[in-house]
Amino acid sequence: MRIAREEIFGPVLVVIAYGDEHEAVRIANDSEYGLSGGVWSADEAHALAVARRVRTGTVTVNGAPVAFGGPFGGFKASGIGREYGAVDLGSYTEYKTITSDVPMGWRHRFDR
């Protein structure tokens, strides 16, 4: 489907039926672009496993906000490098940011 292969900027919602998870990942990855994507699931561990298979520079899980301290940039034709984060580790590395719906204040547990 053409709309699933193009890089669209704007308020657009695309809904495409798929048979199983493998087909959903195939549809998501069947594009020359890979800036951002999202995975929704009641099972967060499963959603994180699927997010690792989606070839985009940023993947949100269950609508989590973007991690502004993480590297920003895309894969494939969407990738012209990375901004933010410590990402100058090599030109052959594809960095991915995965965000999840972690409760606010989660960082404080490490301050002790």
Where would I find each of the regions flagged by the language model?
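Conserved C-terminal structural/oligomerization subdomain of aldehyde/semialdehyde dehydrogenase
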Residues: 1-112
